[in-house]
């Protein structure tokens, strides 16, 4: 046999318009399913009776760790993407602020350069401090 499709007996023949499938994208195929952050957080015994602040910090650390490479670092490009997807409500409306533009430009420079957790948290807190959402949070009443 020549190896062409018509002469190979074990070759499956597909229609021109195959039915859509619900399979995972090829990049995710074979990858273990990620455990939700809430379940990861719940599995940390020391935080069973943790304060809201402790749990908030642990959540930020878990989000970072789930995206970091085996050495515990993120590229600047990955950092920018993570902040834009996981911190979008804090970033919203900041696009024209000079400090925000400066921070994003710094992430765009040498996008493959790696940053550690400390630098990530500094970026996270800096973006939160710039945010219009922070003022809204400050205005929330904590008592009746």
UniProtKB/Swiss-Prot annotation:
Residue ranges, annotated region (Disordered): 1-31
Keywords for the protein's UniProt record, in alphabetical order: Cell projection, Cilium
One Gene Ontology molecular-function label: calcium ion binding
UniProt subcellular location: Cell projection, Cilium
Biased composition (Low complexity): 18-29
One term under GO cellular component: cilium
Family annotation (InterPro entries): EF-hand-dom_pair, S-100_dom, S100_Ca-bd_sub
Superkingdom to which the source organism belongs: Eukaryota
Additional facts recorded: 'Sentan' means 'tip' in Japanese.
Stated role: May be a component of the linker structure that bridges the ciliary membrane and peripheral singlet microtubules.
Protein name per the record: Sentan
Organism of provenance: Gallus gallus
Taxonomic path: Eukaryota, Metazoa, Chordata, Craniata, Vertebrata
Underlying gene: SNTN
